[in-house]
């Protein structure tokens, strides 16, 4: 008794094995990508939330691809292998469907990436605006700091100048007061000789020059000392009454020139 056995075409067996191998490879690839995604997520959880960079954008893209592949893997697990006749029309139809699906997935990914890029662009513009504002504030503060420093220097110089001016004015006033007091003292105690006695009349007549007071002689010696400190000597003139000169020399108020006795200078009491 013979049994009817249904023979399976070798090409059909080969096609089924190819589909199974493809599914296993796809599952293996998805598992590897899933493991990589978990590692990346663990690293990101340790780093914390930061502004997206190029690496973060690529990571987001990989995560979306992983989700798509996971969904596709789930569909593959639910599907049962079917023996499909591998003719040209069927393959063309399947290829179109796969390409259409891939196109939809890529358009979705592209839309997501464009949305993230727009957000990053807005964040960049906002950060750039903040940076420009901070730079303007910094420039303004630098200008104010420079103005304050210049003002401080100006105020310091002005204050010093005013203080020196006040001191000079006070010294001049004290000098005038001192000269007036000295002049009054000298006029009272060392007046010019009067032509009341014959001896004085003869001494005055012998000199044709007009005699000057002791105060005027001292002022001349003082001015010479401060105006020409390197040559403070004054030549004795006919208008200098000789007793005045002897008085100044005797009490050490004036000194003769070591080489020219006709010149005298004031003793440098200030040195």
Swiss-Prot record:
Coiled-coil blocks: 11-44, 102-151
Localisation: Nucleus; Chromosome, Centromere; Chromosome, Centromere, Kinetochore
Coarse class of the protein's main subcellular location: nucleus
Record keyword Coiled coil present: yes
Cystine crosslinks: none
Keywords for the protein's UniProt record, in alphabetical order: Centromere, Chromosomal rearrangement, Chromosome, Coiled coil, Kinetochore, Nucleus
GO biological process, one term: chromosome segregation
GO CC term (a single one): nucleus
Pfam families, per the entry: CENP-K
InterPro entries in the cross-refs: Centromere_CenpK (IPR020993)
Highest rank taxon of the organism: Eukaryota
Tissue: Highly expressed in testis.
Self-association state and partner proteins as the record states: Component of the CENPA-CAD complex, composed of CENPI, CENPK, CENPL, CENPO, CENPP, CENPQ, CENPR and CENPS. The CENPA-CAD complex interacts with the CENPA-NAC complex, at least composed of CENPA, CENPC, CENPH, CENPM, CENPN, CENPT and CENPU. May interact with Sox6.
Function summary: Component of the CENPA-CAD (nucleosome distal) complex, a complex recruited to centromeres which is involved in assembly of kinetochore proteins, mitotic progression and chromosome segregation. May be involved in incorporation of newly synthesized CENPA into centromeres via its interaction with the CENPA-NAC complex. Acts in coordination with KNL1 to recruit the NDC80 complex to the outer kinetochore.
Family of this protein: Belongs to the CENP-K/MCM22 family.
Protein name, entry field: Centromere protein K
Lineage of producing organism: Eukaryota, Metazoa, Chordata, Craniata, Vertebrata
């Amino acid at each position: 008794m013979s049994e009817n056995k249904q023979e399976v075409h070798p090409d059909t067996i080969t096609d089924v094995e190819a589909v199974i191998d493809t599914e296993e490879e796809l599952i293996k690839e998805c598992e590897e990508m899933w493991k990589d995604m978990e590692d990346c997520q663990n690293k990101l959880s340790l780093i914390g939330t930061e502004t997206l960079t190029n690496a973060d954008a690529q990571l987001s893209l990989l995560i979306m691809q992983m989700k798509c592949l996971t969904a596709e893997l789930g569909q593959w697990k639910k599907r049962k292998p079917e023996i499909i006749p591998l003719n040209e029309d069927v393959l063309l139809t399947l290829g179109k469907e796969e390409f259409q699906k891939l196109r939809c997935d890529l358009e979705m990914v592209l839309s997501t990436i464009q949305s993230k890029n727009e957000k990053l662009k807005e964040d960049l513009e906002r950060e750039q605006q903040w940076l420009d504002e901070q730079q303007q504030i910094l420039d303004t503060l630098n200008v104010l700091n420079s103005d304050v420093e210049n003002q401080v220097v100006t105020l310091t110089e002005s204050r010093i100048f005013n203080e020196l001016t006040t001191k000079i004015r006070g010294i001049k006033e004290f000098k005038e007061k001192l000269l007036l007091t000295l002049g009054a003292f000298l006029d009272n105690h060392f007046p010019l000789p009067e032509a009341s006695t014959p001896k004085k009349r003869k001494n005055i007549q012998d000199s044709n020059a007009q005699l000057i007071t002791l105060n005027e002689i001292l002022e001349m010696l003082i001015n010479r000392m401060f105006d020409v400190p390197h040559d403070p000597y004054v030549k004795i003139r006919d208008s200098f009454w000789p007793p005045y000169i002897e008085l100044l020399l005797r009490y050490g108020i004036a000194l003769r020139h070591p080489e020219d006795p006709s010149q005298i200078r004031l003793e440098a009491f200030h040195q």
